[in-house]
Design a protein with these regions (language model features):
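Active-site/ligand-binding-proximal alpha/beta "capping" segment
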Residues: 118, 126-144
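Conserved acidic residues
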Residues: 58, 120, 150
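Short glycine-rich phosphate-binding loop at a beta-alpha junction
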Residues: 57-64
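Short Gly/Thr/Asp-enriched flexible loops that form oxyanion-binding sites at enzyme active sites
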Residues: 69-75
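Short, glycine/charge-rich flexible loops or terminal/linker lids adjacent to PRPP-binding catalytic cores
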Residues: 76-122, 188-192
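Active-site-facing substrate-recognition patch
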Residues: 2-57
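PRPP-dependent phosphoribosyltransferase catalytic core
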Residues: 139-193
Length: 193
């Protein structure tokens, strides 16, 4: 399969610094989801901006905290679903449960109703997608709020897992910047779609 040349900088970085772990886990915490490479985030943000050009977006919704830096380029408010209820978030909230593929557990995500409503046009942003459970949770929150879902941007999609295809089958405008077709823990080889 011919590899897409867009976002080559991201794919090169995944190949250079990504580490494949047991259970089809791709560890990219040195530049994406623990320590953030701000110049790479800027390029990722610009690419999402290009791919969703012409769409009216009033809010970005992500799960804390990986999508926050990426969303900055859109110049609209970024709402992030919290993984734990805090005293700061009291009163009316949207909440749903999501299953984390990487962490192998289910957790609640919470968004205050104050920040998401029927007038919003929402773009979802997340760093990773495997089975798509986090995206399904965010989509449910958008539906519960009465807002309009514009689309979803994923930095790294595991194309060999069902999440991306399931969302596309539901008609979601999904843009994944790097789709991993396969990865080999023994050789360290990562093949992109």
């Amino acid at each position: 399969m011919m590899e897409d040349k867009e976002m080559q900088i991201l794919k090169d970085r995944i190949r250079k610094d990504g580490k494949i772990r047991e259970g089809n886990v791709l560890k990219v915490d040195s530049f994406l989801n623990h320590q953030m490479d701000v110049s790479l985030f800027r390029e990722i943000g610009k690419e999402f901006k290009r791919r969703f050009e012409g769409e009216e977006i009033t809010k970005i919704l992500t799960i804390e905290a990986s999508g926050i830096g990426i969303a900055e380029v859109f110049n609209v408010p970024v709402v992030f679903a919290k993984k734990t209820q805090t005293k700061n978030i009291a009163g009316d909230v949207y909440t749903t449960q999501v299953e984390s593929y990487t962490h192998g557990r289910i957790y609640d995500i919470i968004v205050s109703r104050e920040f998401l409503g029927p007038d919003d046009k929402v773009l979802l942003i997340d760093d990773f997608m495997a089975n798509g459970k986090a995206m399904e949770g965010l989509i449910q929150i958008v539906k519960d709020s009465g807002a309009q879902l514009v689309g979803a941007g994923i930095v790294i999609e595991k194309g060999f897992q069902p999440g991306g295809d399931a969302l596309r089958d539901q008609g979601v405008h999904l843009e994944s910047l790097a789709i991993v077709e396969s990865m080999d823990e023994k050789t360290g080889e990562i093949v992109f779609r």
